[in-house]
Structures are given as structure tokens and as C-alpha cells.
Amino acid sequence: ELADLYRKLVTGDGLDNLLRQFVQRESADAFKERVKLTQHVVTTVTKNIMDVFYKVPRSNYQRILEHLGDNSERMTAELEAVMSTFWGVRNLDEYVQTRWLEMNATDPNGFVVVEFKPFDNQRERAKPYPYEVTSHEAVDYKYENNVLQYLTVKTSFSLPINQKKDKVGDNYALYLQNETLNLQEIDPATVTTSLIENQFVPTENGQYLLSNKRVYFLTESIPHNAGRVPAKPVGYLRDAWTNGQTFVSPYDSAVPLLLKSVKVNSELDITMSQQVFPHRLQYMPVCKADGCHKGRLAEGGICGSCKGTGHDSITSAMDIIYFTMPRDAADIIDLEKILVFKGPPIEVVQFQKDYVTDLTAGCKAVVFNSESFSKMQISGTATGELLDRDNVQDTLYSCAKGFADTWGFYVWMTADFADLSKGLNAKLVFSKDFQLKNMSELISDLEAAKRSEV
């Protein structure tokens, strides 16, 4: 559920489903019309928040990747070469800098499994790559003392057989500390061996299993003997609701305000539409169609001209209503009493607009514990601005620790699979205060350095 909500807030896909009808004052038709008119801004807000976290991979951290002992330079160069194709044509560093933050925004409870395809270990090294597992696909996993013991992943694939109405088969991958097992549903017609319910039947290449009238085939991959499950959860911020057993997105503290903004922004859109296209109140002349009497015809039918209203209608505000000029000025009609346009009070529009703006600023302030992203910083004191910036950097430092931990895990798994982990020293080092200086501060530092040289 959390992943579904995060995806809506980040991508906008399904955001309309978050809108709720105000039953006491809004009919079903009026609600549908409001949904059509709503242009969501919450995706812009979440992107604006997440963009700040991209300062982490752009910060000045220390990247240590080296081997100690014999042939150290050659082994490091080979590991860098293996890492260069970790993400297709992009390297491992680029994967963490890009996808890790993207997945934290939409599905922090997903996993990334480091895998490799079969290879000839006499002639080449393994080429590890990331396999992304959504939180929906991670159907079972277990931790002991914060160490992942196993991960079970369920995926679906096309299985066009008569016994399955949906033509979809299930595949289960069980990632263990030294090997991986795969249980895939197959067509029962391809099995010639007698099977017994819930009992494995060994064959030359694997084992058959009959379960709930479904037939599966179990295979074991070549043991990787890494000594740990080659999977790591995406998230780095632990969820207090689950006592730290699951994770939340970096902007999770702003979710209540984001949901409020979905509602308020929708109401503002309908209010603005009513302001631009106000309600028209007017006295209408009687329908002049032959046989029309208060919208009804003599034979009992509805008048086709006035559609049963009994009045002549005006199709748009550009139409003109003509009145004969009276001879006596006292007989002139006050036109303001015949036609008037009524829209929402401008105070209501301004209130809603300010409310949306305040919610947007509040989202950023809550995530970073700072007012640095609002107009209020303009009139703030220098000390206050420094404190605000420190709060932002504290938030980013938590992200930096998760970033470094994730990078290190991927590098070590890649080195293990490529048989290049002996003597490896790999880590990212961020400054504990995580100071990100602005341009003016950097210029001041350079000027101070020049003065010290004189």
C-alpha cells in the first residue's frame, strides 16, 4: 500500500483516486466534474523535494576502491572494468546515483538483487548486474540480527495453457546465502512422470512438484558461495510504525500535507473555474414557440424549443438581449435587476490559493526541518539561515550514509561474484557535518587561501 501511494504522489498515476466526494454538499455528477477539472501539482512538489537529495551523489565525498597485497593494481583495474557494465552501458556508481534515489522515492521497501548469468569461469569473470524487486514481488524474507537470511521473490509470466483462464504462470526465486533456487510453474502436459501432491519428484535437471493442481519445476543455480544473500533493501529511513522492520520514503513526513494539497488544489481548480465562468442569474422571457405553455405542448409532450423550461434561452454571454426603448424615461428597466453574474468571493479564492502555497512550503519545511525553501528566508537573520542550512544537511547526511552503505554492498557483491574480493578495500566516506557550501562561501574560501599564501 505504501508503494502504491508513493507511486501516485511521484508519478501522478492514479492521483484522482485520492480525491474524495464531499457527500453533504457535492453530488456524484459534480464530483466527477471536479475530478475532470483538477490539475494535480503534488507531483511537482515531490519532485522538488527529491531533487534536493541529488546533492548527495554530487557532494565532495571520498571514494576508496583499492586492493591490498600482490597484483593489487591489476585486480582493482579488473574490478573497475567489471563495474563499468553493471548497469548495461553505465557503471555501478551511476546506478546508485540514479536508480537508488528514484526507487527510494517510489518503493523503499523493494530490494535490489545482484545477479550474474552463467559464464565460463576458465575464460572470463562473472558480469554482475542489478535485478530490481518491487515490494509486491518480495513475498517473504527474514532477518536475524539485522542480517538478511533469505528472500523469496514471486513474479508472473505468460503461460498460455487451457487449465489457466488468465494464461499467467507463477515463478518463485529463493535467494539464500550461498545459492539461489528457482521454482517455475510449467505446463502439466509436458510432464510424463507420475506426481504426488506436495512431494518433490527428482529428475536429471531438477525436481517436479505438484501443488494445488499446479505443476512446478525446481532448479538450483550454481552456488555462488558469497556467504550472504545477494540482496539489499532499497530504503534507508526506517519506519517507526513497524518498529524499524520496513522503510519509508525520504519525503514520508510530508505525506499528510501532500494529501491535503491534493484535496485543496482540487477545490481551488473548481473555484477558479467558477470565477472565470460565474453563475448567471437572470429573468427570462416566456418561450414563444407555437403551442408551448410553460414548457409543455397541448398533446402533453415537451417543447422542443425551450426543452421544457418555458423560457427562451441565451446560449452564451456574447448573445445580446434586446429591449424596446420606452417613450417615457420612467419606464426604463434597470438592467442590473434582469441579469447578474455571481462567482465565489475573491476572498475565498485568495484563501485557497494561499493555503495551497502554505502546504507546498510546509512539505519542504517538514522534510528538511528548515524554512530555507520558502520566501521567509529572505528576511531571516544570518544565524537563522545557517541553522536552517545545518538542518538540511543533517537530513542529507542520513541519505549519504544510506548511499554509501548501498554502494559498498553492490561493490562487494560484484567483487565476490567476479572473484576479485581478496584484499579489497571499498567504501565511500562523507564528512560527518556534511557541509555543502554555496558559491559565495567557496569564493570566500579561495580568497582566504590566496591571502594565506602571501
Where are these regions (language model features)?
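Short amphipathic alpha-helical segments that mediate assembly, nucleic-acid/protein binding
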Residues: 2, 15, 193, 439-442
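Long amphipathic alpha-helical segments
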Residues: 311-454
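Extended, helix-rich architectural segments
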Residues: 1-149, 153-156
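Extended, charged amphipathic alpha-helical segments
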Residues: 227-378
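Glycine-centered flexibility motif
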Residues: 108, 134, 295, 308, ...
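Extended, regular secondary-structure scaffolds
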Residues: 92-248
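Generic detector of well-ordered alpha-helical segments enriched in charged/polar residues
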Residues: 3, 20, 32, 47-50, ...
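Alpha-helix initiation/capping motif
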Residues: 46, 76, 176-177, 230-233, ...
